[in-house]
Amino acid sequence: MAEWRWIRIFADHLERCGLGAGEVVVVLSESSSRPELVETARLAAEMLGGRVFDLVVPTPVNDQPVAIRSTGASRALQGNPAVLAALATAGLVLDCTVEGLLHAPELRTILRGGARVLMISNEHPESFERFRFSPDLGMRVAQAHRRLARAGCMRVTSAAGTDLTVRLAGAVTAGSTGVTSGAGSIAHWPGGLVLAFPAPGTVEGTVVLAPGDINLTFKRYMERPVTLTIADDHITEIAGDGVDADLFRSYLSAFAQVEGDRSAYACSHVGWGLNEHARWDYLELYDKGAINGTEARAFAGSFLYSTGANEVAGRFTAGHFDLPMRSCTVTLDGREVVEAGQLVVDPDSEIS
């Protein structure tokens, strides 16, 4: 059941996304969506005078050998032309699907119609109480994105042993502020991170997942180190003697057996977090079913390494790991943007 404290927070955010009286708003959900999230979104949009209607689709059967979690690639729309027509002609789509439309194959069709899409992360509404609006977050994300888009090389190191090189030529970059930016735009809430989807053959080195880093598919903090050796974009070795390494190997191998290739082992995207209100330690305070993990992707000073699908590299797979890491140093063309897990204030005031 929705509560007033959540409705007010959602309404404030929808105002930032430009929702005003009379605009057509679709609240998109599926049969497995979180009911209190859907209700809160609907009531907030109605409060602002939106012409609101619900569009509910069935959650499809999972055709994979393992459970799918936290991918950002909802399969709920199933290419249904009537559903796509309704979404594309709306002013604002409030995406309350379980996985979200961010990487869904139908997203481009919806955005081409001019709709704005706000992907509301599948968190318990209580979580949004902590995602306070920072007036400067949009500026800082834009500045960080400009630096990332101009850079030729990203290098990531850590005291734990990470030493990763990503050549950025041909990469597609993006920044998320959490706020839609006009017709045909998408944002996910909470926001506050920048990402690069590398071109093929550009990622190599070593990633060491240290205790306290997070595997968001499992909603689990790493307890023992796991070392990933990466060559030609793909994980070639998973080293570690604890259950974290065993889980990592087991989950990815399931996709390789079904899909017949190693796309699940490949690099999906890399980036860093800028959201000062997001926290890395919040997982301990919620049941796994109450969260999706977007907050962990965005906490300030994090480095995010992700495996799985990458359209830029021509790779498609249902297997996906988002791996937010602490205490990393991230450089772009030799200039630090994150030092040992802390955001670096740029001397030219381009990023803080």
Residue spans for each PLM region:
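Internal helix-turn-beta structural module
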Residues: G289-S352
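Dual-mode signal for accessory low-complexity, basic/Gly-rich regions
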Residues: Y221, E237-T307
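Active-site bordering "gate/hinge" segments
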Residues: M1-A231, A256, D261, C328-S352
